[in-house]
């Protein structure tokens, strides 16, 4: 799972510049093709969302939603960066999961 993460600032910038964006009321998704056979995930939560406890909770919810839906019919070979919006700070798991699946369907990589 370690190789499936986007960690470096340079990698995030590449996805922001070269990728296409999709958004809804809770999340923003930037997606860009990579040269691997796997999807790589990056999560970004601004300080506007709340204090560190809230930001980390939102990050955990996004990562867990992605992990549980990873084995379903999802196309491979993409870099995905999810950005949490301010309205996501008080949402529960089901809300985050439905927003995440909605964005993946908009991007055309989730069937």
UniProtKB/Swiss-Prot annotation:
Catalysis performed (reactions): Endonucleolytic cleavage of RNA, removing 5'-extranucleotides from tRNA precursor
Any one GO biological process: tRNA 5'-leader removal
CC per GO annotation: ribonuclease P complex
GO MF terms, alphabetically ordered: 3'-tRNA processing endoribonuclease activity; ribonuclease P activity; tRNA binding
NCBIfam families for this protein: rnpA
Function comment: RNaseP catalyzes the removal of the 5'-leader sequence from pre-tRNA to produce the mature 5'-terminus. It can also cleave other RNA substrates such as 4.5S RNA. The protein component plays an auxiliary but essential role in vivo by binding to the 5'-leader sequence and broadening the substrate specificity of the ribozyme.
Protein name: Ribonuclease P protein component
Organism field: Clostridium botulinum (strain Loch Maree / Type A3)
Gene from which this protein is expressed: rnpA
């Amino acid at each position: 799972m370690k190789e499936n993460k986007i960690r470096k600032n340079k990698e995030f910038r590449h996805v922001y510049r070269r990728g296409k964006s999709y958004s809804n009321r809770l999340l923003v998704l930037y997606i860009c093709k990579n040269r691997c056979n796997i999807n790589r995930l990056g999560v970004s939560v601004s300080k506007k969302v709340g204090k560190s406890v809230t930001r980390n909770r939102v990050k955990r919810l996004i990562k867990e939603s992605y992990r549980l839906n990873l084995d379903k019919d999802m196309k491979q070979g993409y870099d995905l960066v999810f950005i949490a919006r301010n309205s996501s700070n008080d949402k529960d798991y089901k809300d985050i999961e439905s927003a995440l699946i909605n964005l993946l369907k908009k991007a055309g990589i989730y069937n």
